[in-house]
Amino acid sequence: MMAQKSQGSDNLQEGQEKSKREILKCTKSAWAPLDEWLPPDPEEESQSLTIPMLEDSKQESIQQWLDSGFFVSANENFQQVIDRTVSLYEQGMVQMTVKDYMRSLHQFSETPILSRGTSFNSCYSTASVPQSIPEWLEFWEIDPVEILLDLGFGADEPDICMQIPARFLGCGSAARGINIRVFLEAQKQRMDIENPNLYGRFRQLEILDHVTNAFSSLLSDVSILPNRAEEKAGGESVQRTSVSAAKEHRRRMGKLLRRASKQNIRRDCNPEVSESFKVKDEVFVPFTKPWDCGAELAATSINHKQNHLSLSVEHQSLQACDDLLPYPPHGLLSKQWPCSSMPAKQAPPSCVSEGSVKGRTQKENLFQTNKLKSLSHLAGKGPDSFEMEEVQSFEEETGNPLDMTSGTVGARVDRANSCQSDSSGFLEEPLEPLPLQMPSLPNSQSPAENGGRKPRDQSHSLVSSQDCQLESDGPDSKSRASMSFSSQEANALEQRASVSVMEEEFLLEAMEGPPELYIPDMACAKTTTRGECPRKDSHLWQLLPMPHAEYEVTRPTATSKYDHPLGFMVTHVTEMQDSFVRPEGAGKVQSHHNESQRSPGNDHTQDKFLHVDSEAPREEESSGFCPHTNHSLLVPESSSQCIPKHSEITPYATDLAQTSEKLIPHLHKLPGDPAQVKSRSGTLGQILPGTEAEMENLPLNTGSSRSVMTQMSSSLVSAAQRAVALGTGPRGTSLECTVCDPVTATETRLGTKARQLNDASIQTSALSNKTLTHGPQPLTKSVSLDSGFSSICPMGTCHAIPAHCCICCHHHPHCHGERQSPGPEPSVCRHCLCSLTGHQEAQFMTTLKALQDTTVRELCSCTVHEMEAMKTICQSFREYLEEIEQHLMGQQALFSRDMSEEEREEAEQLQTLREALRQQVAELEFQLGDRAQQIREGILLQLEVLTAEPPEHYSNLHQYNWIEESNGQTSCSKIHPGMAPRTVFPPDDGQEAPCSGGTQLAAFTPPTLENSTRMSPSSSAWAKLGPTPLSNCPVGEKDADVFL
């Protein structure tokens, strides 16, 4: 029995082994191509003959796999894969791995796949087919090693980027703004460069600390040097730090001496002129260049946006130029050109004591120390860039030390072509002075003007006099002076500011010829080529330099006064501000000479108005102009001598700056006493120390004529649009007001060309008195508004002397503190309501009424009504949309059963679009309502501010500020009650002067324009005050009060 059982078991085992052997034979035929086509054994061939042959080998293979319990996809892809694998091996490539084989079969096989690495014992037979889910999961288990290898692990790669999977590098990132490759390169570079040692980093901090200490000590030494130099009266020069510095100093000193000797030769050639250049005080050095004294600082312009130092008016003549220099006095950035005819204010109003000089010295040192802190990067090259040694060396040679009372009136710097990129810009010993060069601003190109060719004469003037004759000698008579400096602190200076000092030229074509006026064409005067945007100082055709010229120079402006021996006085004010460049295209400056010939018997003067207009873009300049106006006021003192004067104003191409000069009758003088002319200038966005040029010895029986053209800012768009309805549209409006003793007339002139340019420029006309005038003559002021406004602006009438005409614009409150002087010189802003103290309440109520009538009714209410109308339209449109939507939804509910799927989707899309449209209309409606509410609140806020302030604030003009708002809007003018259209002031003789014009010019002045006019207190009668409408004032603008 045991033998039979053992034999039965043996038979069973043999049967199982036989079946396994047969399965192996069947499966091995399938693996044969992968086993490099090994020849089969003879036994296997003989046994395979017993297997029934099928018609197709493919069906036989399927049957064999089915019998063995495996399922292979019976399609052609399997055979294609095998054939491809065979071809790869035939080409000699490496044998395929398990991973590659599984990937090649996985794309078309959905059944279990036999792996080459699995032995026959591990293969499932008919009895070991997976019967449960865990077995099938184990059968389909993926090898984790292959996954890690796919991810890039397990490979020894030197590049760290290879550890990142290929899908992150091969495919672009869906995130915006992320560049994986740039990030990886940056990280790799950082790992390569960075020093992982922390000690190295702390060492860097230590080195930086040492460098900071060194610079701090250097700055302290430099700040102490000017005090020592002043105490020693310029007796010693700065020590040379190196041999090269000494050589450079000697070279510059030689150049300076050669130039000084050349000026001495010129002075000797003109003995008549040199007689007038005598030393008035022992602290001044004789000036060797005659025409420099008359025009050295007459056209000074400075780029200065931050004014953080308030100075008193009584110290203007002593420290005005010092404010222009951020550097110590021992480095005056210039050659001290001594001038005997440019004394600091020696008149009694401006004389100060020694204590005030010491106090000014302390303030000056503190100011210079603060400036030096912002210029630490320039401390290392002071002697080279700033020519500190040159000034003191020249003082040693001439034996004239610096004087504190003289300031830096005669200081200037010779700068080379502005195309140089270094900080100093000095050339190597030029043989002769080069043409006038303009330093460039940070935001504008400034190619050299008249560069590379001989500069032509910019001014021609013929004056017949007995004691003052001059002749200039070509290019040497034109000197360049500019001071360039930079700072690192925003509160001190802007990126790059430049102070440009020009001197005017005077040419005598004939030594004893009759007086003749030569007016060149302005088109010829422009030498800028296409594509250039140079900054050009105005070329003024003025009188000869006066023997006694006094200067008042402040930080942003410079005012010069010429005291002509013949009795003429010229006030020249120059101002520049880097705040705003006109966006319009280029304009060509054209000169229009409007001459009105009047008979000598009518006691009228011959007025010539030179209008410089920015017309349409021309070929000569492609950059936009931002006018920078330099204008001068000429008032003849002697009625028996009539000298022509021509003033040409060329606007600067960089900044918007406006200066205005008005004839101001003195407040404390009788009609027969000399009058006083004040020149006030304001700059947009900064505090202006006022520049006041007083004109003494001006009789009232002389005629004067002046033309001022003002172009408004481009922010007054809404008013310009409304002006179209009045018939003016974009046409330039020019108002000419002739103020005389018996009659005040207003004449309105419309421009002949439509202009869209909204810039601001002020210019003065030429004064030409061809006849002898005795007695009061009309003072003609022409104002041109190129802003697209109508001329309906109220203005009160006034007569010549003792009228009170005050046009006061709101400005920085710092102006008043700076202009208040204890001396006899009155302040400009102190006179505003000195004669109106008894009428404050009536004026206040009239002003409030005028504000309500003009701003609320004509401007703001119209805009609010328009917004309300648009809001109503949007609301009705939204309601209409809702009705349509309800109707469509009802129709859709009825026919929804018959609609197809596409029609339903289209209906849903239309519904979404309607909802979005309704939402946008609602949002627009809300915005319109909110805007209207903001306008109402703004008007109410202005009224509350106006009513909350006491009336005495009007006398001090502290109530508002002319700081430019972010939206770029300009001022909206309020009309003082005195500015009624038919207000008439009786003259001294009691006669009542009727008004010949319906409307008068109001304060349509830009925020940078500030005009002050005084009248004599003898004006006793005031007309009835009444409100008048002021049209075309934009909403949200600042206010300007106009007092008459």
Curated annotation (Swiss-Prot):
Residues 1-20, 230-251, 388-489, 583-607 are annotated as: Disordered. Keywords: Coiled coil. Residues 388-398 have a biased composition (Acidic residues). Residues 896-937 form a coiled coil. Residues 1-14, 460-469, 480-489 have a biased composition (Polar residues). GO terms for molecular function: signaling receptor binding. InterPro entries: ITPR-bd, SSFA2_C, TESPA1-like. It holds the Pfam family KRAP_IP3R_bind. Signal peptide: none annotated. It comes from the Eukaryota. The keyword Coiled coil applies. PANTHER family: PROTEIN ITPRID1, SPERM SPECIFIC ANTIGEN 2-RELATED. This is Protein ITPRID1. It comes from Homo sapiens (Human). The lineage of its organism: Eukaryota, Metazoa, Chordata, Craniata, Vertebrata. The gene is ITPRID1.
